[in-house]
Every structure is written in structure tokens, then in C-alpha cells.
From Swiss-Prot:
Its EC number is 3.1.3.16. The lineage of its organism: Eukaryota, Fungi, Fungi incertae sedis, Microsporidia, Unikaryonidae. Gene3D superfamilies: 3.60.21.10, Tetratricopeptide repeat domain (1.25.40.10). Mn(2+) 2 binds at residues 225, 257, 309, 383. Mn(2+) 1 binds at residues 198, 200, 225. It comes from Encephalitozoon cuniculi (strain GB-M1) (Microsporidian parasite). It comes from the Eukaryota. The keyword Metal-binding applies. Binds 2 manganese ions per subunit. This is Probable serine/threonine-protein phosphatase ECU05_0440. SUPFAM superfamilies: Metallo-dependent phosphatases (SSF56300), TPR-like (SSF48452). Its cofactor is Mn(2+).
Length: 457
């Protein structure tokens, strides 16, 4: 493919992009970029070819930005800069840094651009970005620290609400980090991994158990449904999001069905926000929804354990398909997303209609097919209040974990799951494969006044 053909292909893709035919445009951009890289001759530089490589990489970056896949957008933005310096690309990378919560990188690049001699277009972009630069300065000053989180915990224990400006800062910082996650987060751990299910606003119970089990050698995963029903939903999600900000590689959060606005507006969370923030409830509630929409859908641990809030969709699916879901939504139009957030396992074959009117009831054969197709050993999900906070389905291939003790007046405990337990009686530990072992641990209610006391680094 010569330079002229590359340019024509790129213009064809641009036309498709303008018509909102995003998938078709991306395919042409990527194919053309790959062909262009084959034309590079080592040890020589062709300025026209470098220009096409830069433009194509930038176009790909823009598509991924539009899809809110900011890590890939950043990768292709930086690739574009390798081939040609461009103020427009620098501005785009600034915007990506901001969305990813990479505030210092944003500030450094913004300062560089201010000192560059730029044309009127870039001057206009910089003027628009000035507000973001002010926000970044504010967040660098109000960045969450372990010390500030401890102090906030003391205030909550004393019966006081989180100040609205502090809460909105936590939500903005957390959203930026969550936006940097793919739909399905792949993570590795050689140590224990603790998985918690629904916590439903039971903030003090969460603080109590974290004080006992959270340390520098353990990864912690919370599997959705942080809000509604309990009386401290605001504090519960703010705490867990703060831990995600502080320990982004060790704390992971997924989205549950109660992180959908049409659910949490009805089941208590919206009323809690109005009660605690009467003068800024709309703004605070909107900030929460922005953060909820940014939550990843699923997590895979050590390429063997698949964690998602609800269960499996009706149609056969591979993990790669899940990465293409548009998750920044509150609608129920995507069948894959509905299945992941709403479905439940039963001892049946195939699938049946769910009484929830969303997702399906799925059987052991559906589980086996999904695990086999994706090279997985175990599905961990939440979504249902079960006896003892823990239930095994489908011959041990599916585990439900529920972490709200004495939920809605019941007497049952909460539980969390320990992957790769380092200790435990032989009859406590379930071995799915040589690489996948787990045990469930029960816990009860706190005294309702717990203060966070994390001593890890």
C-alpha cells in the first residue's frame, strides 16, 4: 500500500466515523496502520509515511477515546507522537491523562503546552482545558491519603456525614481511576485474594472486617451492590472507592445491579443522598452515578477465576466479547450486560426466564461451557442473600458470596471467599484444580461504631 492509498483509506474511514459507523471506521484505521508499519524501512525516515502513521494512530486513539477505552486511547496517542509531534495529539493525551486520573502527568504536559508557540486552534483548546487544570490543582491538594481516610472514618463514627466537597472529590478521583479499567480486569496474585459480595450500605460491618483482614499481602475484591437498603450507602461506597484510589492494584471493585440509577433511585440510596445532602443532593447523586457507570463489569484472577456480580448471559460468550460491551450506561438493552449483572444459577440444564425480569436463570451446562471456552476453573458471583453468606452451585464450579450480615433483619452471617488460602483445615478448603483452591469465612455484625484502622503500606 503506497502513501496515496493509505491517505484515501484514512479519508474513507473518517467519512464512516462522521456517520457514526465506528466499528467499520476502526477496522479500516487499524488495517491501514498495520499495512503502513510494514512499509517502514529500518534505518531510513520517510516523512510522508511517518505523517500517515501518526494520523492513523491518532484516529485510532480518538475512536477508543469515544468508546471510553482510555488505556488503549493513550497507547495509540503516544504511538502517534512517536511518528510526528502534533499539538492536537498533545491536547488529546492531556485529556486522556485527566480521564485516567494521571494528574501529575496531565499537569506536566499541560505546562509544556502552555510554553509552546501554538496556533489559534491549540490556544482555544488550552483555554478550554484551563478549567481542568484548576480542578487538577484542587485534587492534587485534596488527594485521598490513608491519614485523611482515618480521620474521615472517625467523623463518620461520630455520626457526622462526609462533607459534600470531600465526597465529590473522592468520587471524581475514583471515577478517573475506574475509567482506566477495561470491562474485564485481569489481575494476578501469588498470595491470598479475598472476595466480598453484596454489602448494601452496611458500612460499619465493612470497616470491622477490613480492620481484621486487610493487609499488604492480600488482594481484596468487592463484587458490587454497595448501596441501597442499608443506612450508610454513601459512606460505604466512599470508603471502598477511597481504598481503590489508595491501592489501585490491590483493591478491585465491580458493578452490581444496584449501581444502576433506575434501581438505586427506588431502593433507598437516592433518599439517603437527599437526606444527608439537602442543598446539593442532585449534584452529589449525579457524581455517584458517574462513578457507578465507570465500574468494571468483571474481574479474572490468575486467568482462572471469573468474578462478576450476577452470572452468565443466555448466549455463549467469550471474555473477549465482554471487552466490547459499552458499560457506561444505565439501560437494559445489552443482553450480555444484563446477564452479567442480573442472572442467577440453578440446578437445571440450559437457561430459563428469570423472575427478576432481567438476565436469566442458568444451569450447570451453561457454566461448564463458559468455563471451558475461556480456560477458567471457577465462577464467583454475588447478587443473592444466601444462608451463611455462602453457597456452592453446579458441582462446585459456581460460588455465591454475600457479605451483609443479618441482612434486612435476618440472623444469617456474612461471608467472604479466600482464594488460594494459606491456612485452614482440610475440610474447609475446596480444590477445583491444582491452581484454584478456596474457602469461605463467615463474619457477623459490628458494634456500629467501628473506626478504620488500616496499618498496611
Amino acid at each position: 500500500m503506497d502513501i496515496r492509498e493509505m491517505d484515501l483509506k484514512r479519508q474513507e474511514a473518517n467519512a464512516l466515523f462522521k456517520k457514526q459507523m465506528i466499528d467499520e471506521a476502526l477496522e479500516i484505521y487499524k488495517t491501514s496502520f498495520l499495512e503502513a508499519t510494514k512499509s517502514v524501512v529500518p534505518g531510513t525516515r520517510n516523512d510522508l509515511l511517518e505523517e500517515q502513521l501518526s494520523l492513523l494512530a491518532y484516529n485510532i486513539s480518538v475512536v477508543y477515546y469515544k468508546r471510553k477505552n482510555f488505556p488503549k486511547s493513550l497507547a495509540f496517542g503516544l504511538e502517534s507522537l512517536k511518528h510526528r509531534k502534533s499539538d492536537k495529539v498533545l491536547c488529546k493525551i492531556c485529556a486522556i491523562y485527566l480521564r485516567l486520573g494521571m494528574l501529575r502527568e496531565y499537569k506536566e504536559m499541560y505546562d509544556q503546552m502552555v510554553t509552546r508557540s501554538s496556533g489559534p486552534e491549540v490556544a482555544f483548546l488550552l483555554k478550554r482545558m484551563k478549567l481542568s487544570e484548576v480542578i487538577v490543582e484542587k485534587h492534587l491538594e485534596k488527594r485521598v491519603t490513608l491519614e485523611s481516610l482515618h480521620e474521615l472514618s472517625k467523623e463518620i463514627s461520630g455520626g457526622r456525614s462526609i462533607p459534600a466537597d470531600t465526597l465529590e472529590s473522592i468520587l471524581e478521583q475514583g471515577e478517573s481511576i475506574l475509567l482506566g479499567c477495561e470491562n474485564v480486569v485481569h489481575t494476578e496474585s501469588s498470595g491470598e485474594v479475598l472476595i466480598f459480595g453484596d454489602t448494601h450500605g452496611q458500612y460499619f460491618d465493612v470497616v470491622s472486617i477490613l480492620n481484621k483482614v486487610f493487609d499488604k499481602d492480600r488482594m481484596v475484591i468487592f463484587n458490587g451492590d454497595y448501596v441501597d437498603r442499608g443506612s450508610h450507602s454513601v459512606e460505604n461506597f466512599a470508603l471502598l472507592l477511597s481504598l481503590k484510589i489508595l491501592f489501585p492494584g490491590r483493591v478491585h471493585l465491580t458493578r452490581g445491579n444496584h449501581e444502576l440509577s433506575d434501581i438505586n433511585r427506588v431502593y433507598g440510596f437516592y433518599d439517603e443522598v437527599k437526606r444527608k445532602y439537602p442543598f446539593s443532593s442532585d449534584s452529589v447523586y449525579r457524581r455517584f452515578q458517574d462513578a457507578f457507570r465507570a465500574l468494571p463489569i468483571s474481574i479474572i484472577v490468575n486467568e482462572k477465576v471469573f468474578i462478576t456480580h450476577g452470572g452468565l448471559p443466555e448466549a455463549p460468550v467469550k471474555v473477549d466479547n465482554l471487552q466490547e460491551i459499552y458499560r457506561m450506561t444505565d439501560t437494559h438493552t445489552d443482553e450480555l450486560l444484563k446477564g452479567l449483572l442480573w442472572s442467577d444459577p440453578e440446578e437445571i440444564l440450559g437457561t430459563e426466564e428469570s423472575k427478576r425480569r432481567a438476565g436469566v436463570v442458568f444451569g450447570a451446562d451453561v457454566t461448564a461451557r463458559f468455563l471451558e471456552r475461556n480456560g477458567l476453573d471457577l465462577l464467583v458471583r454475588s447478587h443473592q442473600a444466601v444462608d451463611d453468606g455462602y453457597r456452592v452451585h453446579h458441582g462446585g464450579k459456581v460460588v455465591t458470596i454475600f457479605s451483609a450480615p443479618e441482612y434486612e433483619g435476618s440472623k444469617g452471617p456474612g461471608s467472604y471467599l479466600v482464594l488460594n488460602p494459606s491456612a485452614g483445615e482440610a475440610d474447609e478448603i475446596v480444590e477445583i484444580s491444582p491452581l484454584t483452591r478456596y474457602k469461605a469465612v463467615k463474619f457477623g455484625r459490628s458494634d456500629g461504631k467501628e473506626v478504620l484502622r488500616l496499618l498496611c503500606n
